[in-house]
A protein has these predicted regions:
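AMP-binding/adenylate-forming catalytic core of the ANL superfamily
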Residues: 299, 318, 323-417
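Conserved AMP-binding/adenylate-forming core of the ANL superfamily
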Residues: 20-33, 37-67, 102, 108, ...
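Conserved AMP-binding/adenylation subdomain of ANL enzymes
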Residues: 141-155, 163-204
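Gly/Ser/Thr-rich phosphate-binding loop
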Residues: 204-206, 216-273, 286-288
Length: 420
């Protein structure tokens, strides 16, 4: 069977299994302790000002009985939080899916002990599923909790997608594993964000550089922010200095990957001197360069592997080779470039193959090639470029409208190149 050949990478039995009894017991004991100690306290603050307590969240999740071999965690923050907890409590793998995406059915059954499934493009540019055990999830959550002192930072504001690894680990998983309350900001724009934050004396705010730029240039007040974190794409020195000069706010740069969780962060209280500075390794994370200069990460939060590994990849058994070329500078990491095919648009990783296929279907044009190019807006990171086997004169507004009819707004090319 082709699926068996692809999945032999894991070295596990190829049949559906629930989360391991040991992992399930570990999570269950942690969660029961949180409910016993903080049952009447708020676990989730909703956009309308109401709050759901830990005891109420526990009851709602236990009432959700998974009907199949997985739980699909999709929707807004309250839905994701309930569904995650329901799957974890019942020992059923939870698959994270963004609101505007369809579920990718894994190409093979999840390996033994799988508790969480992410579907992501990542640096490779290929959308795949990634599998994680309870222990691997907890390792990433606890590593950030300790290094960033999240237990003493107040409420975590979920203004970015909780279906993404960064938003997931910094907010709702902190709630489920460490009892840190989450505040739901229904939209990442200035007014909804301020409405969400204003009820709390102290909050920590994760965001991507494009959002931080929007917040800093808008009317957002940051008086109650105890910690500002940026990830997803490089944080420029200009944006970091704007935050300090305009608001006295230090934005800490965090680096990681969905496959292995957080790797390093800028722990300094002042501005960096080099925009490539990715900070120091987080405790328990080891890193080195391979012969191609790519960063190889070894830690307890590295996942089990992909559903469809590509030739030459190394992912699993505690080790992950990234698509990023990194230069060590003493105890700090310095970003050089990404050598993967993935396109990074404002912190969102996109697949060139997926975009090209949608344009082919919509335009009925076979010759479509998609790649990323550096954007003039550094916070955007990259722009999408479409190269078409079509005379340039025929790439008019009507053609673009038709060609983009199947694309999400963030997948639309900014540059179109045809034949002379």
């Amino acid at each position: 069977m082709n699926c068996q050949r692809k999945c032999s990478f894991y070295g596990t039995a190829l049949h559906m299994v629930y989360a391991s009894p040991q992992g399930l017991q570990m999570f269950g004991e942690r969660w029961d302790r949180i409910v016993a100690e903080r049952g009447a306290q708020a676990a989730l603050y909703l956009a309308d000002g109401r709050a759901i307590t830990f005891r109420e969240l526990d009851a709602e999740a236990r009432a959700l009985k998974p009907g199949g071999d997985h739980v699909l965690a999709q929707g807004d923050v309250p839905q994701i939080l309930r569904l995650l907890l329901a799957g974890f409590l019942h020992g059923v793998p939870v698959q994270m899916v963004e609101k505007d995406r369809a579920r990718r059915i894994p190409a093979c059954p999840p390996p033994a002990g799988t508790a969480l499934i992410k579907q992501a493009v990542g640096g490779s540019g290929v959308r795949r599923c990634q599998f994680f055990t309870f222990d691997q999830i907890a390792a990433d959550v606890d590593r950030l909790h300790a290094a960033l002192d999240l237990g003493d930072r107040g409420v975590g504001v979920a203004a970015i997608s909780c279906a993404h690894s960064f938003g997931l680990t910094m907010t709702v998983l902190q709630t489920l594993f460490n009892g840190v309350p989450t505040c739901h900001a229904p939209q990442p724009f200035a007014q909804p964000l301020m409405d969400a934050m204003k009820h709390h004396p102290r909050v920590f705010l994760p965001g991507v550089p494009a959002l931080w730029k929007s917040w800093l240039m808008g009317d957002v007040r940051f008086d109650n922010i105890s910690l500002a974190i940026s990830a997803g794409s490089p944080l420029t020195l200009g944006l970091e200095r704007m935050a300090l000069e305009k608001h006295g706010l230090k934005i800490h740069n965090l680096y990681g990957a969905s496959e292995c969780g957080a790797v390093s962060w800028d722990e300094t209280p002042g501005p960096r001197e080099d925009g490539r500075d990715l900070g120091i390794l987080l405790p328990g994370v080891q890193a080195r360069r391979d012969d191609a200069g790519r960063l190889v990460v070894a830690s307890s939060s590295v996942g089990l592997g992909y559903d469809e590994p590509l030739p030459g990849e190394r992912y699993g058994a505690g080790v992950f080779t990234t698509c990023d070329q990194i230069e060590p500078h003493g105890e700090r990491l310095c970003f050089e470039q990404s050598v993967g095919a993935g396109i990074n648009v404002a912190g969102r990783k996109l697949s060139p193959a997926e975009i090209a296929e949608k344009i082919r279907r919509a335009s009925r044009l076979d010759g479509v090639r998609i790649h990323g190019a550096r954007s003039r807006d550094p916070e955007r990171c990259q722009d999408i470029v479409a190269e078409l086997d079509l005379p340039q004169a025929e790439i008019d507004p009507a053609f673009k409208i038709r060609a983009c009819s199947l694309l999400a707004p963030w997948e639309v090319p900014r540059k179109w190149i045809g034949r002379p």
